[in-house]
């Protein structure tokens, strides 16, 4: 699973806030799946959750211009990969747009 977008934000701190807000939007709804966000560096985090004993992980990385999400979808969930990418992408876009508009 791959997703990338030009974030259009002036600094990495605001991009990080967007990642945290997007994660937070799903954390409560997906609480049964034990969601987890781990920051490995200032510009790199791993998001993981477990569904039907299958682990789904995604690495979120960003630089001055671009935000990228690269994840592993277990074989069992391959038919849903496009939907997962779409949901992740739209949630990130929503928070990035709010940040660009000065709402967060």
Regions found by a protein language model. Give the residues of each.
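Secondary-structure transition/turn motif
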Residues: 49-53, 72-77
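Short, exposed beta-strand/loop patches in secreted or surface proteins that constitute
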Residues: 35-40, 60
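Short, hydrophobic/aromatic-rich segments at coil-to-beta transitions
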Residues: 39-47
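Terminal, regulation- and interaction-focused segments at domain boundaries
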Residues: 1-18, 24-29, 34
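A conserved amphipathic terminal alpha-helix motif
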Residues: 77-104
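A short, structured beta-strand/loop element
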Residues: 48-66
């Amino acid at each position: 699973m791959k997703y990338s977008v030009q974030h259009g934000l002036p600094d990495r701190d605001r991009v990080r806030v967007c990642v945290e807000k997007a994660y937070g939007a799903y954390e409560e709804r997906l609480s049964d799946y034990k969601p987890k966000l781990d920051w490995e560096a200032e510009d790199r985090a791993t998001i993981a959750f477990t569904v039907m004993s299958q682990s789904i992980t995604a690495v979120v990385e960003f630089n001055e211009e671009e935000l990228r999400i690269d994840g592993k979808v277990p074989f069992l969930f391959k038919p849903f990969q496009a939907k997962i990418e779409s949901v992740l992408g739209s949630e990130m876009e929503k928070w990035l747009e709010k940040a660009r508009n000065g709402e967060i």
